[in-house]
């Protein structure tokens, strides 16, 4: 990552090389999704729950490999997949997301 960008990241867990998404970015991201009230949401990379806790629905699930709920083992029906996945495995994340056949994938 460019040092000019890296210093602006407010929260980072260097032990796991995790970057946490700021709440204002999550709110903007979620505001761009056209959803129905009964949609089932999935946050495949829960982290601290910043996406999950701001989903506009109670019909939601999460995955988090650090909590033994690996997204790559997830096979339930879902309408919307939304999160900020690790870029190091982004291609695999997209493949798995498409396999689940949601109506919306938003990363």
Task: Enumerate the language-model features and the residues they cover.
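Structural alpha-beta junctions
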Residues: 56-61
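S-adenosyl-L-methionine
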Residues: 1-55
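Conserved acidic E/D residue at the C-terminus of a beta-strand in Rossmann-like folds
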Residues: 43, 62-67
């Amino acid at each position: 990552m460019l040092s000019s960008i890296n210093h602006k990241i407010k929260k980072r867990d260097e032990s796991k090389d995790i970057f946490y998404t700021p709440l204002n970015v999550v709110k903007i991201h979620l505001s761009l999704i056209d959803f129905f009230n009964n949609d089932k949401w999935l946050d495949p990379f829960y982290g601290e729950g910043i996406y999950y806790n701001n989903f506009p629905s109670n019909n939601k699930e999460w995955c988090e490999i650090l909590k033994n709920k690996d997204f790559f083992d997830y096979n339930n029906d879902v309408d919307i997949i939304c999160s900020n996945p690790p870029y190091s495995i982004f291609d695999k994340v997209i493949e798995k997301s498409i396999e689940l056949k949601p109506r919306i994938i938003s990363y």
